[in-house]
Regions:
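Bacterial carbohydrate/catabolite-sensing allosteric modules
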Residues: 1-143
Length: 143
């Protein structure tokens, strides 16, 4: 998976100890939540690497009496079908996977047929799908 790049200074109270990589299963979701519960305060929100992990985390938090989005916000990535069927409905990042596949296949065919020798860099715009797993946070960012 590719990393998500953002300016950490724009995130209020960003704490790098929550940067956990290569976790994508039930046990990983529990490990992340266990680590959060060791602290005095829960983070304002979680951005999960995919919707499946976000949904697992919502369920685990619910089992511990933490309610999404009232107590913590969660955002997933990939906009899978089930993300709009869970409670709360998951806010997610929709990536144009079908269009990426079509463009990749066309590029590969052109390369095989000798029509292209150049390396192509294609940028596609993801979209935020706002549902119910995020609450508004009113905070001031220090400069």
């Amino acid at each position: 998976a590719l990393p998500i790049v953002f300016n950490k200074r724009r995130i209020v109270n960003y704490d790098s100890k929550y940067d956990i990589y290569n976790i994508g299963d039930d046990q990983g979701a529990i490990q992340i939540i266990d680590k959060m519960f060791e602290e005095e305060y829960l983070p304002e929100g979680i951005v999960a690497i995919n919707d499946s992990l976000a949904i697992k985390m919502i369920n685990e938090l619910h089992n511990r009496g933490i309610h999404v989005p009232n107590d913590i916000s969660i955002v997933g990535m990939d906009d899978i079908f089930v993300s709009k069927m869970v409670t709360p409905r998951l806010t997610t990042i929709h990536e144009p996977a079908e269009e990426m596949g079509k463009r990749s296949a066309k590029y590969l065919i052109d390369k095989i047929e000798g029509k292209s020798r150049n390396i192509v860099n294609i940028t596609m715009q993801p979209t935020l799908v706002e549902r119910n797993s995020v609450r508004k946070v009113h905070s001031k960012i220090r400069r």
